[in-house]
C-alpha cells in the first residue's frame, strides 16, 4: 500500500476522515497541526488511500531537540486506522517510522485510540512498539 503526505488542498477530506473515526481526537485535526506548527513543530499528515479516499491517517509531529541532538516524534491520539486491517496499519506505521528516522527522532510516541488489552499490546509489539 502507498502512503502519501496530504497537502492543504485535501484539508476538508482530512478533517472529515478524522471526525468520523470512532474515537475522534481534536489533536488529529488539521487545525491542531497548524497550531503545533506555530509552536515550532514540523507537521506531517500521512494517509493511506484506497479508491481515492483516506482509509488510515496519522498527523505526525516532529520537534527538534536543542543542540542538534535529533528530534522527538509524536502522534497525539493516533494513528487513526482500522487496526484489524494489518496491511494498512503496517504500511502507515512503516512510513511513520521512515519519516521519524529521517528527522533523527530519538523516540516516537503514539497514542492509538485502542483499549488496553493483552491482544492490543501484542499487536502493537508486533508492529514495532
Describe the role of every protein-language-model region.
Residues 1-30:
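Short amphipathic alpha-helix that is part of the acyltransferase structural core
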Residues 108-129:
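Internal, well-ordered alpha/beta segment that forms a basic, Gly-enriched binding/recognition surface
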Residues 23-24, 32, 77, 126:
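Generic secondary-structure boundary/loop-capping signal
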Residues 33-113:
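Conserved donor-binding loop and adjoining core beta-sheet/short helix segment
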Residues 12, 67, 117:
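Flexible, glycine-rich phosphate/dinucleotide-binding loops
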Amino acid at each position: 500500500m502507498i502512503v502519501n503526505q496530504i497537502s492543504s488542498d485535501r484539508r476538508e477530506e482530512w478533517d472529515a476522515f478524522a471526525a468520523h473515526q470512532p474515537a475522534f481526537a481534536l489533536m488529529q485535526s488539521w487545525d491542531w497541526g497548524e497550531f503545533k506548527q506555530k509552536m515550532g513543530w514540523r507537521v506531517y499528515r500521512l494517509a493511506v488511500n484506497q479508491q481515492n479516499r483516506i482509509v488510515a491517517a496519522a498527523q505526525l509531529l516532529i520537534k527538534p531537540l536543542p543542540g542538534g541532538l535529533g528530534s522527538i516524534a509524536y502522534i497525539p491520539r493516533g494513528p487513526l486506522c482500522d487496526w484489524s486491517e494489518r496491511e494498512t496499519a503496517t504500511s502507515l506505521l512503516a512510513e511513520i517510522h521512515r519519516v521519524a528516522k529521517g528527522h533523527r527522532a530519538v523516540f516516537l510516541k503514539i497514542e492509538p485510540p485502542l483499549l488496553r488489552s493483552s491482544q492490543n499490546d501484542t499487536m502493537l509489539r508486533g508492529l514495532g512498539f
